[in-house]
Design a protein with these regions (language model features):
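Acidic, proline/glycine-enriched N-terminal capping motif
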Residues: 1-119
C-alpha cells in the first residue's frame, strides 16, 4: 500500500473536546465545538472515501502553520474521527505504531497514513 492522504478541518484541542456537566458527580460530554468539528470532518471524510485500514500504521499529521496552539493536544481529535468513521480499526498500539505531528503550510489539517515498518 502506498500512502493515504486525508484532508480534515483544523482539529480542536483536547481541552475543547469535552465539557463538564453541572451538578453532583463529574459527568463529561462532547462540547458544541467538538460536535461541530466532528460533523464537518465527517462530511469531508465522506467526500474523500478513504479505505478501511486493518493493519499497523504510522500516522503523520500536518497542521496549518498560520494557526496557534499546542500541536500535541490535537492528536486525539484526529485519531478519534478516523476510528469513528471506520478508517482505522482502533487507535491502540496494535494498529497505530507511531504518530507524528507538526506545523506545515497546509489548509486545516493533512493526515498521511502509511503501513508501519518493523524496526
Amino acid at each position: 500500500m502506498g500512502q493515504i492522504t486525508i484532508r480534515l478541518p483544523f482539529p480542536v484541542s483536547i481541552n475543547e473536546m469535552y465539557v463538564n456537566r453541572a451538578g453532583p458527580g463529574r459527568s463529561r460530554y462532547p462540547s458544541p465545538v467538538f460536535k461541530a468539528w466532528t460533523t464537518e470532518a465527517g462530511l469531508l471524510l465522506n467526500t474523500q472515501r478513504p479505505p478501511r485500514i486493518g493493519y499497523r500504521v504510522t500516522i503523520h499529521i500536518d497542521l496549518d502553520d498560520r494557526r496557534q496552539g499546542d500541536a500535541d493536544s490535537r492528536i486525539k481529535c484526529v485519531l478519534d474521527i478516523l476510528v469513528k468513521h471506520g478508517i482505522l480499526v482502533d487507535d491502540r498500539k496494535k494498529f497505530v505504531k507511531r504518530t507524528s505531528i507538526g506545523w506545515e503550510p497546509v489548509e486545516g489539517c493533512v493526515v498521511r497514513i502509511e503501513r508501519a515498518t518493523d524496526e
